Curated annotation (Swiss-Prot):
<keyword id="KW-0496">Mitochondrion</keyword>
<keyword id="KW-0966">Cell projection</keyword>
<dbReference type="InterPro" id="IPR011032">
    <property type="entry name" value="GroES-like_sf"/>
</dbReference>
<feature type="binding site">
    <location>
        <position position="204"/>
    </location>
    <ligand>
        <name>NAD(+)</name>
    </ligand>
</feature>
<feature type="binding site">
    <location>
        <position position="184"/>
    </location>
    <ligand>
        <name>NAD(+)</name>
    </ligand>
</feature>
<feature type="binding site">
    <location>
        <position position="299"/>
    </location>
    <ligand>
        <name>substrate</name>
    </ligand>
</feature>
<feature type="binding site">
    <location>
        <position position="156"/>
    </location>
    <ligand>
        <name>substrate</name>
    </ligand>
</feature>
<dbReference type="GO" id="GO:0003939">
    <property type="term" value="F:L-iditol 2-dehydrogenase (NAD+) activity"/>
</dbReference>
<feature type="binding site">
    <location>
        <position position="209"/>
    </location>
    <ligand>
        <name>NAD(+)</name>
    </ligand>
</feature>
<keyword id="KW-0560">Oxidoreductase</keyword>
<feature type="binding site">
    <location>
        <position position="70"/>
    </location>
    <ligand>
        <name>Zn(2+)</name>
    </ligand>
</feature>
<dbReference type="GO" id="GO:0031514">
    <property type="term" value="C:motile cilium"/>
</dbReference>
<dbReference type="InterPro" id="IPR036291">
    <property type="entry name" value="NAD(P)-bd_dom_sf"/>
</dbReference>
<dbReference type="Pfam" id="PF08240">
    <property type="entry name" value="ADH_N"/>
</dbReference>
<feature type="binding site">
    <location>
        <position position="45"/>
    </location>
    <ligand>
        <name>Zn(2+)</name>
    </ligand>
</feature>
<feature type="binding site">
    <location>
        <position position="51"/>
    </location>
    <ligand>
        <name>substrate</name>
    </ligand>
</feature>
<feature type="modified residue" description="N-acetylalanine">
    <location>
        <position position="2"/>
    </location>
</feature>
Length: 357
């Protein structure tokens, strides 16, 4: 009787600008505090595409082959000797950022700001668009039975929305402006509504995406064309009947940031989520004399348990955001689909024996 074939670890690897390959990597062995995961669902993020097209994002440069992917869920295959809270067969969502040391940022609970943090698919750290992947067990969270693998993978972008709404102080009764109806804008809309926002208006260039925003809960939408930032602000105020207390900017576009400052209520908060140019001209005086606080967002921290609770309780529904699914073997086709701007969230299915949501 022939021996069973050893499982392969097919992985999606970027070698440099425009050079994306499917390759077989060795199956890693988990350390004492790690788990080996059989990957199931991994979403494609804009950052993955940037590394593919440009080979870099800012100072993060692909200098050696790197496995992509960081929006992920999977099943525990093997546990390290010191892992007590997980066992083989557990379904988990993966928080991609795991601190390497207990530095000053970890001590105050803001580990996302740690300069030495491990983060999936950020050079030089490999991601998890592969069959098998090992990760710090403390940053793998068990999924309830009523939360699917795909919902588990969506916790990563959902966490950006949670962190942004926390930074903005979104609470009961607030009017909120969300600039941008891409995946991050959409999850921010969902979180703002779940946190008690009375009205949320979403702006975007795309009528199709704004239609989806209305479908998932936006109270108001505004399609942008060639208006000035001041005109956009006036239109937002006209729709809401007042200026929003919180604006969450998810595009990174300079004109959108400017509109956000003009639009936000005096004493309110503008949260910058989208990453654009390093240098951007903004009407800072207009923010200063009206005490509009401008806050940044870098990834997230302490969000996975909250996100899991929101999904399990059906406080948010991320399923409508998933528009395309591809097996890992067709990852190159999936990335081309993303590049063409088709769909919203594209999922890659990494387990050849389980392509279900």
């Amino acid at each position: 009787m022939a021996a069973a074939a050893k499982p392969s670890n097919l992985s999606l690897v970027v070698h440099g600008p425009g050079d994306l390959r499917l390759e077989n990597y060795p199956i890693p062995e988990p350390g004492p505090n790690e788990v080996l995961l059989r990957m199931h669902s991994v979403g494609i993020c804009g950052s993955d595409v940037h590394y593919w097209e440009d080979g870099r994002i800012g100072n993060f440069i692909v200098k050696k082959p790197m496995v992509l992917g960081h929006e992920a869920s999977g099943t525990v295959e093997k546990v390290g000797s010191l892992v007590k809270h997980l066992k083989p067969g557990d379904r988990v969502a993966i928080e991609p950022g795991a601190p390497r040391e207990n530095d000053e940022f970890c001590k105050i609970g803001r580990y996302n700001l740690s300069p030495s943090i491990f983060f999936c698919a950020t050079p030089p750290d490999d991601g998890n668009l592969c069959r098998f992947y090992k990760h710090n067990a403390a940053f793998c969270y068990k999924l309830p039975d009523n939360v699917t693998f795909e919902e588990g993978a969506m916790i990563e972008p959902l966490s950006v929305g949670i962190h942004a709404c926390r930074r903005g102080g979104v609470t009961l009764g607030h009017k909120v402006l969300v600039c941008g109806a891409g995946p991050i804008g959409m999850v921010t809309l969902l979180v703002a509504k779940a946190m008690g926002a009375a009205q949320v208006v979403v702006t975007d260039l795309s009528a199709t995406r704004l239609s989806k925003a209305k479908e998932i809960g936006a109270d108001l939408v505004l399609q942008i064309s060639k208006e000035s930032p001041q005109e956009i602000a006036r239109k937002v105020e006209g729709l809401l009947g007042c200026k929003p207390e919180v604006t969450i900017e998810c595009t990174g576009a300079g004109a959108s940031i400017q509109a956000g400052i003009y639009a936000t209520h005096s004493g309110g908060t503008l949260v910058l989520v989208g990453l654009g140019s390093e240098m951007t001209t903004i009407p800072l005086l207009h923010a200063a004399i009206r005490e509009v606080d401008i806050k940044g967002v870098f990834r997230y921290c302490n969000t996975w348990p909250v996100a899991i609770s929101m999904l399990a309780s059906k406080s948010v529904n991320v399923k409508p955001l998933i528009t395309h699914r591809f097996p890992l073997e067709k990852a190159l086709e999936a990335f081309e689909t993303f590049k063409k701007g088709l769909g919203l969230k594209i999922m890659l299915k990494c387990d050849p024996n389980d392509q279900n949501p």
